Curated annotation (Swiss-Prot):
Residue spans of biased composition, Basic and acidic residues class: 742-762, 803-825
Mutant phenotype after disruption: Decreased sister chromatid alignment along arms in tetraploid cells (4C) nuclei and impaired sister centromere cohesion, associated with a high frequency of anaphases with bridges. Slightly slower development leading to delayed flowering.
Any coiled-coil regions, as ranges: none
Reported tissue expression: Expressed in tissues containing dividing cells such as seedlings, flower buds, flowers and inflorescence meristem tissue.
Keywords associated with the record: Cell cycle, Cell division, Centromere, Chromosome, Chromosome partition, Mitosis, Nucleus
Protein name from the UniProt record: Sister chromatid cohesion 1 protein 4
InterPro entries with a match to the protein in the record: Rad21/Rec8-like (IPR039781), Rad21/Rec8_C_eu (IPR006909), Rad21_Rec8_N (IPR006910), ScpA-like_C (IPR023093), WH_DNA-bd_sf (IPR036390)
One protein family per Pfam: Rad21_Rec8
Role this protein plays: Involved in sister chromatid and centromere cohesion during mitosis.
Length: 1031
């Protein structure tokens, strides 16, 4: 393959192409954008230097990938641009009726001269009707047509209802001339001769200048009321409900500690009074003109009083409605008294107690209201009655041009004609509380929905509604001129949530609809009104703890879900899944917690190995180790000499060298027993008995100690008459661990040597093993022969305290005597007699010692593991040598522990040696280097090879470790190590480090590694370099 290096260079013409073919993810977007596909293809087709076919194919693949990346980038950019365009021109989903899809031009277009600073209250020409305001809707849209000629109403919408402006500006409309109301009283008078009654003259209690304007109102109010004329008030209790003042007849004063706005919301709930009272006054003409000034003064004083309480008014109805009601209506069916709450007047206390003078003294306090449909009380012939209402607000102005619906209710007797004229001048106020309505600004922001019929307001539930009167003029029944109260503009969180979420607000506009007075801003800017309708609150479904399904359950058969469809999880669903996972929680199995449960679980995992485990639980570690310890009984041989004695000879491997003699009274036993001989106190020699001379006369050996108790263990009697005589019992340790017969030949003539000094200062005598003599020596010495390898015998100095406090007290010597034969898995019990490797004698025993029965008794178990010491002498003084002997015993134990790893065969030796000598495998190189810095200084450069100067500390440690093992193996006659034995019991980390360092030594030709077949044991052999080097 030949090509120019410049072609595939990083800045070459095809460098990016080659990267795209092999390392597509390494390309950046700017690299893809800068690549010219045409130029690249031409460079491949017509290269400067010949290109191999394989390279050209790779380059073409890179071109294709770059082109694909470019297409993807372009597609993403186009998709993003299209999405932004759609979002920019996307219209909100507004549910508008067809006729309101487009708004009139003048409703959505502001005049060029519109300026908020130009909003000044006009002069008196407002009241003369000569002022034209171009910033409001036309007069035809906001004014109802009435039949009265000459009545001029102001078209101004400015007043207390507008929300903008300072306090002085909002109160400016209250400076009304008294003549305006007086003229309206004359115009609105009836042909009955009663002076003109202007119901718009009821001003709010907080309005300034109300005292002067109340004089015209007081003249228009009736003086007397009878019980029959207000009987309909009992049927309209729902119209009298007030959120701040409870409707309690006995409640005289209810303090209102709320704010001014809350008092305003309370005050706009008008008292309801039957219109028949006024009609009765008009028809009867019973008006006491002399009491009118008094009532005017009372009314003015009541309005000037602070608004802190709402007082119920007890009205005498005995003189009301006697002319309006039908002639055949019984009077006894009418209500006697009605307690009417009057929230717009505050302190009416003592004047209310006299029913006969209620209206004479506080006639202005009874404010009538007109509901939509108020049926008569048990009167079949009376279809309907006209009511009137005066809506007032505390911080609002009293508009002299209130608009009202033309309610043409039919009356058979024709007695309510004047009431129609009154209704045309007054705005009708419904009898429900509209405190749940949001302000018009929020209502305008709600999308318009199709209204249901003519019911835009709260669906009231009149007691007895006459369908004939309400449905005949359904088109004109809209309360378009109603003044929205301040409570309607007050919005709570609950009402807002219910309005916006459930969609209870309904808006309806008709051709003759007129904006409300308090919705001035919307009438100026938009030109539409916000008539409201509330539907009954739907019944909430009970909440369930289970998670709702994201998709409805389909009864049809399952079909394959298209994975291309977008899967969208709503935020509420994800939040619910994060906060509550009860429905997806699964019941878990009970895990074993107690010890028996865990043991049972472990036993189940054992399967077949269960039969090899003990059935008892909770055993100590010692018992478990004894149970798990393997025993090899193949090398044990028992030789019976006579009926009373069983002498166990040396096994084929010559594994034990303990002489034991059993008494006559005992049964056949293999427990070794050491006994004193009947010789003088002069020193004797230790005997090495061959196998054929194992028969010993029991009577001669036990002639002086027949009084001793039977012992199946090793017994040593000691003299205890106060002298510091000691019996240094040297037990031949684990000769059974000698693996081969070659070792037996070397140690056949081992001699026992032990130097000892008594506490009295007597020196021990050195004796040699002599098979012809049976004299007992004070000290038994065992020579190791001509080899220096693993010491075969452990010397133990078993000492017994001369005095123990109690007879039953025992001293456990297991802490002082090292375990014998533990490393060799074959125990030493059942082997007595002298072996070819050594003998055991007890010496320095006098006749007194043989006769003393109170001497301490030293018991050694047959396996040499747990010797027990018992003292039967309670009166002898404490031997001073006891502490010294114990310390000596501990020292011997440590010596035994360090040696016992080398006393068995090669397999066991490796196991024990590695457990103690391979700690360097767990040490890092840095720590090992610090330890060996001083060691390196000791050696001269001439004594070590130059080749291992650059080795790591761990490599040197492994080489030294192998060198030591090979030296010991050479002494044993072997020159081979098995890797499996070296790595037995090691962790994975230690084994890996050992294996690596072995390979290093093999590479440097320090060792030879062989493996005959795969998966067989690896054999390690030393090389001359290893034996000559010093590490």
């Amino acid at each position: 393959m030949f090509y120019s290096q410049f072609i595939l260079a990083k800045k070459g013409p095809l460098g990016t192409i080659w990267i795209a073919a092999h390392l597509e993810r390494k390309l950046r977007k700017n690299q893809v954008a800068d690549t010219d596909i045409g130029v690249s293809v031409d460079s491949i087709l017509f290269p400067e230097a010949p290109i191999a076919l394989r390279l050209s194919s790779h380059l073409l693949l890179g071109v294709v990938r770059i082109y694909s990346r470019k297409v993807n980038y372009l597609f993403d950019d186009c998709s993003e641009a299209l999405l932004k365009v759609k979002q920019a021109f996307r219209s909100a989903a507004v549910d508008l009726p067809p006729e309101e899809s487009t708004a009139p031009y003048h409703s959505i277009t502001l005049p060029e001269t519109f300026d908020l600073d130009d909003f000044e209250l006009p002069d008196n020409e407002i009241f003369q009707g000569n002022y034209v305001d171009h910033h409001v809707s036309t007069k035809e849209q906001i004014t109802l047509q009435d039949t009265m000629d000459g009545v001029v109403y102001s078209t101004s919408q400015f007043g207390l209802d507008e929300r903008f402006g300072d306090g002085d500006t909002s109160q400016a409309a209250l400076d009304l001339d008294e003549a305006v109301f007086q003229d309206k009283d004359v115009i609105g008078s009836d042909d009955e001769g009663v002076p003109g009654i202007d119901h718009n003259a009821y001003l709010d209690a907080a309005a300034p200048g109300i005292k002067d304007s109340m004089e015209g109102v007081s003249e228009a109010m009736p003086m007397d009321f009878n019980e029959e004329q207000v009987e309909d008030l009992a049927m309209n209790n729902e119209f009298i409900e007030d959120a701040q003042a409870p409707q309690t007849p006995g409640l005289v004063e209810v303090p209102n500690s709320s704010s001014v706005r809350e008092q305003m919301a309370c005050d706009d709930h008008m008292d309801v009074e039957d219109l028949n009272a006024e009609e009765g006054i008009k028809s009867s003409g019973e008006l006491n003109a002399n009491e009118m000034p008094k009532r005017g003064e009372d009314l003015s004083s009541e309005y000037n009083a602070p608004e802190s309480a709402v007082t119920p008014v007890e009205v005498d109805k005995s003189q009301i409605d006697e002319n309006v009601n039908t002639q055949n209506e019984p009077e006894e069916e009418r209500a006697e008294h009605v307690h009417v709450t009057s929230p717009c007047c505050s302190h009416i206390t003592t004047e209310m107690e006299d029913p006969g003078q209620v209206m004479n003294e506080a006639g202005a306090n009874v404010v009538p209201d007109k509901p939509d449909a108020v049926p008569p009380l048990e009167t079949p012939g009376e279809e309907n009655r006209d009511h009137f209402a005066i809506a007032t607000e505390v911080n609002q102005e009293t508009d002299s041009s209130l608009q009202g619906d033309e309610q043409a209710y039919s009356r058979p007797d024709g007695q309510l004609n004047n009431a129609h004229e009154t209704d045309e001048q007054l705005g009708n106020l419904t009898g429900f509380t509209d405190s749940d309505f949001p302000p018009p600004e929020k209502v305008l922001a709600v999308p318009n929905r199709q209204g249901d019929g003519n019911d835009f307001m709260v669906e009231s539930t009149p007691d007895k509604e006459d369908p004939g009167t309400c449905n005949d003029d359904a088109g004109n029944n809209n309360i378009t001129g109603k003044k929205r109260t301040f409570t309607e503009s007050t919005l709570t969180a609950e009402s807002l949530n219910s309005v916006e979420s459930v969609g209870l607000i309904q808006s309806k506009r008709t051709a003759d609809s007129v904006p409300d007075d308090d919705d001035l801003l919307s009438s100026i800017l938009v030109g539409k009104s916000s008539f409201l309708k509330m539907r009954p609150t739907p019944v909430l479904e009970p909440a369930t703890t289970k998670r709702l399904r994201s998709a409805p359950r389909s009864t049809a058969t399952k079909r394959k879900v298209l994975m291309d469809d977008p899967m969208v999880l709503h935020g509420d669903i994800i939040r619910q899944q994060l906060t509550n996972t009860e429905d997806i929680r699964r019941v878990r199995k009970k895990a074993p917690c107690t010890v028996p449960e865990i043991v049972m679980l472990q036993r189940q995992a054992l399967e077949d190995g269960l039969f090899k485990e003990p059935i008892f639980t909770g055993m100590s570690v010692e018992l478990v180790s004894l149970h798990t310890e393997p025993y090899d009984l193949r090398g044990i041989m028992i030789i019976e000499n006579d009926d009373r004695h069983a002498s166990v000879g040396a096994v084929e491997d010559n594994e034990c060298s303990v002489t034991a003699v059993e008494e006559n009274k005992t049964e056949e036993s293999s427990d070794p027993q050491a006994h004193p001989n009947d010789c003088e106190e002069q020193p004797g020699t230790a005997h090495t008995h061959p196998q054929e001379e194992q028969t010993i006369n029991q009577q001669e050996e036990l002639k002086d100690d027949n009084e001793l108790a039977e012992k199946s263990d090793l017994e040593v009697l000691k003299e205890g008459n106060g002298a510091a005589d000691e019996v240094n019992l040297v037990v031949i340790d684990d000769v059974s661990q000698i693996p081969s017969e070659e070792k037996l030949d070397r140690v056949e003539d081992l001699q026992v040597e032990e130097s000892h000094e008594n506490h009295d200062g007597e020196g021990g005598q050195d004796v040699c093993a002599d098979p012809n003599e049976k004299s007992c020596t004070d000290v038994i010495e065992i020579a190791e022969g001509d080899t220096d390898i693993n010491p075969i015998f452990n010397e133990m100095d078993l000492k017994v305290e001369d005095e123990l406090p109690h007879e039953d007290e025992k001293t456990d010597a297991s802490a002082e005597v090292s375990e014998l034969g533990r490393d060799d898995q074959t125990p030493c019990d059942n082997t007595v007699g002298s072996t070819e490797t050594g003998c055991l004698e007890a010496g320095d025993l006098s006749n007194m010692a043989l006769e003393n029965c109170n001497e301490p008794l030293v018991e050694a178990n047959s396996d040499g593991l747990n010797p027990e010491t018992e003292s039967y002498n309670k009166y002898e003084p404490h031997n001073e040598m006891s502490n010294e002997e114990a310390s000596m015993q501990n020292a011997l134990d440590g010596e035994h522990t360090s040696r016992d790893g080398l006393m068995g065969d090669n397999d066991e030796m490796d196991t024990m040696e590695n457990a103690h000598d391979t700690g360097f495998l767990n040490v890092d190189d840095d720590e090992v280097d610090e330890d060996h810095e001083e060691d390196d200084i000791q050696y001269d450069d001439e004594t070590r090879l130059l080749e291992n100067s650059g080795w790591s500390s761990r490599t040197r440690a492994v080489a030294k470790y192998l060198q030591t093992l090979f030296d010991k193996e050479t002494e044993n006659g072997k020159n081979v190590l098995v890797a499996d034995k070296l790595l037995a019991g090691k962790t994975r980390k230690e084994a890996s480090r050992m294996f690596f360092e072995t390979l290093v030594l093999k590479t440097r030709d320090y060792i030879q590694v062989e493996q005959g077949k795969p998966y067989e044991s690896i054999i390690i052999k030393p090389r001359p370099k290893l034996t000559k080097s010093i590490f």
